[in-house]
Amino acid sequence: APNQVWSMDFVFDALSTGRRIKCLTVVDDFTKESVGILVEHGISGFRVTRALDEMARFRGYPKAIRTDQGLEFTGKVLDQWVYQRDIKLKLIQLGKPTQSAFIESFNGKFRDECLNEHWFCSLAEARIRIAAWRRDYNEHRPHSAIGNLTP
């Protein structure tokens, strides 16, 4: 069922100016839907929790969130946030990306089809193009893992 487990991770890229951007990607493991992609120059643990609250506003919170052991995901801020919402935090083992196969697969498609296809001039342009790609991913692309339906 939807909202059982969300997986999240970071993908990094750079603008044409050389300035780095950081994308927080969140996927529903059951529906394969891209729940959200947050695009910023930097993303703190607190910003991760704010983004998750925004993503949950219209769809509800997941029962669990799967992620790697990155600093933003293992700090006190996220730990308190999941505790307050009765969400289980599932940290994968270090060096075992196959334990989060859904988000790794999504991130590969995101990099190949969006990030590698565009040379963003600004953070605003990156956000617009990434949002358009996400919309297409969710609304028009069939996914073999769910019987060639769209999420």
Region locations from a protein language model:
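Charged DNA-binding/catalytic regions of mobile-element recombinases
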Residues: 1-151
